[in-house]
Curated annotation (Swiss-Prot):
This is Acetylglutamate kinase. Pfam families: AA_kinase (PF00696). Belongs to the acetylglutamate kinase family. ArgB subfamily. Its EC number is 2.7.2.8. One of its GO terms (cellular component) is cytoplasm. It comes from Psychromonas ingrahamii (strain DSM 17664 / CCUG 51855 / 37). The record marks 11, 220 as: Transition state stabilizer. InterPro entries: AceGlu_kinase-like_sf (IPR036393), AcgluKinase_fam (IPR004662), ArgB (IPR037528), Asp/Glu/Uridylate_kinase (IPR001048). Its main location: cytoplasm. PANTHER family: N-ACETYLGLUTAMATE SYNTHASE, N-ACETYLGLUTAMATE SYNTHASE, MITOCHONDRIAL.
Length: 260
């Protein structure tokens, strides 16, 4: 596959699922882009906000360990329903409305990814690895838009919830895609609140130490740096500005490029 046609994987944060207009703008931008370009696209998504809502309605208290949701196996049907069901189909609905040939998938479909339990203390939380790219490559070749939830199935036949960032990295490795993290920020800001065009580990560590990068942005940056270690580089941009997304897809500099 040539560089011009290298797939782009868009990882969507769960917060965008609560913003109907942002979703419509996003998929409209993708539709505009694909009218003139043939670059294969994929989406991997989380859905923590919807999981929280479902568990709350079930009167289930949710706990986290080092930022990862503890998911007892008796809770995984609700979590899988929220992620592979509600979250995935909300995105599918917007994609289809925009005229995109979207296909809703999980990490398990077509044996795309293998998963093992991450930590017994976390319960039904898995870590995935690339396995078989045939299904995704076929869909991409035929012009479909895979929309992939972070639910996987282990060799033990049990359902697992995988961190969506890690799932996105794994799918990128599987199909040779570039990775774009879309969140609610334009990129990483410097001390003057200007977007940093390119960020490496050394600069990120300094800005975190100086508390220029902190709280939620620090979490995003650390995830991006981890992804860059495996993929070479990733992009951070905002779903709030769909016009910038079209520019980014066209190869223009938008947001922050995170490198090793």
């Amino acid at each position: 596959m040539t560089q011009a046609l290298k797939p782009l994987l868009i990882k969507l944060g769960g917060a965008v699922l609560e913003n109907e207009q942002a979703l419509e703008n996003l998929f409209s931008a993708l539709t505009v882009y694909l009218q003139t370009e043939q670059r294969p696209l994929l989406i991997v998504h989380g859905g923590g906000v919807i999981v929280e809502d479902v568990l709350k309605k079930m009167n289930i208290v949710s706990y986290k360990k080092e930022g990862l949701r503890i998911t007892p196996f008796e809770q995984i049907p609700y979590v899988a329903g929220a992620l592979a069901g509600t979250s995935n189909k909300l995105l599918m609905a917007k994609a289809l409305k925009a005229g995109l040939s979207a296909v809703g998938l999980s990490l398990a479909d077509g044996f795309s990814c293998k998963v093992t339990q991450l930590d017994p203390d976390l319960g039904a939380v898995g870590i995935c690895s690339p396995n078989n790219p045939a299904l995704l490559n076929t869909l991409l070749k035929e012009g479909y838009l895979p929309v992939i939830s972070s639910i996987a199935i282990g060799d033990d036949g049990r359902l697992y919830n995988v961190n969506a960032d890690q799932a996105a990295i794994t799918i990128c490795e599987l199909v040779g895609a570039e990775l774009l993290f879309l969140s609610d920020v334009d990129g990483v800001w410097d001390a003057h609140k200007q977007v940093i065009p390119e960020l490496n580990t050394q600069l990120a560590d300094r800005l975190i130490a100086e508390k220029v990068i902190q709280d939620g942005m620090a979490v995003k940056v650390k995830a991006a740096l981890q992804a860059a270690e495996q993929l070479g580089y990733v992009m951070l941009a905002s779903w709030k500005n769909p016009e910038n997304l079209v520019s980014l897809l066209a190869g223009q500099a938008v947001g922050t490029k995170v490198v090793k």
